[in-house]
């Protein structure tokens, strides 16, 4: 399978990504094929507006129940907020993937 070359985020996360405050994203199985070492074009989900490029550092499986304060810190939010956001986006999904990245 070819590694994805694009990634989208809700526009509300753009400022944190650009400021380096958000350094991971948590996705479901449909987005687990990002490959470490590749660079992706990043755009807003709502408008499709490109706002940066990210280098994928790692892709690791994680269960929703294993999310902790460290993940929340990397997402620049509290653990309670992180879990709430994940449940809104991926209701009822236990198997997730942590994608770590850096802006290039």
From Swiss-Prot:
Disulfide bonds: none
Keyword line: Hydrolase
Residues in ASCH domain copies: 7-93
Catalytic activity: N(4)-acetylcytidine + H2O = cytidine + acetate + H(+); N(4)-acetyl-2'-deoxycytidine + H2O = 2'-deoxycytidine + acetate + H(+); N(4)-acetylcytosine + H2O = cytosine + acetate + H(+)
Keyword Transport: no
InterPro entries the record matches: AC4CH, ASCH_domain, PUA-like_sf
CDD domains: ASCH_yqfb_like
Regions annotated as coiled coil: none
Domain of life: Bacteria
Entry keyword Hydrolase: yes
GO CC terms of this entry: cytosol
Active-site residue numbers: 22 (proton acceptor), 25 (nucleophile), 75 (proton donor)
Entry's Gene Ontology molecular function annotations: hydrolase activity, acting on carbon-nitrogen (but not peptide) bonds, in linear amidines; N4-acetylcytidine amidohydrolase activity
Broad class of enzyme this protein falls into: hydrolase
Stored SMART domains: ASCH (SM01022)
EC number(s) reported in the record: 3.5.1.135
Similarity annotation: Belongs to the N(4)-acetylcytidine amidohydrolase family.
Role this protein plays: Catalyzes the hydrolysis of N(4)-acetylcytidine (ac4C).
Official protein name in the record: N(4)-acetylcytidine amidohydrolase
Organism in which the protein naturally occurs: Vibrio vulnificus (strain YJ016)
């Amino acid at each position: 399978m070819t590694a994805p070359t694009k990634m989208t985020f809700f526009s509300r996360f753009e400022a944190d990504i650009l400021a380096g405050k958000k350094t991971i994203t948590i996705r479901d199985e449909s987005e687990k094929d990002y490959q470490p070492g590749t660079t992706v074009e990043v755009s807003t989900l709502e408008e499709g507006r490109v706002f940066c490029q990210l280098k994928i550092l790692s892709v690791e499986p994680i269960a929703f129940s294993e999310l902790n304060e460290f993940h929340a810190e990397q997402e620049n939010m509290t653990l309670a907020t992180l879990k709430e956001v994940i449940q809104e986006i991926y209701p009822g999904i236990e198997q997730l993937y942590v994608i770590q990245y850096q802006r290039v």
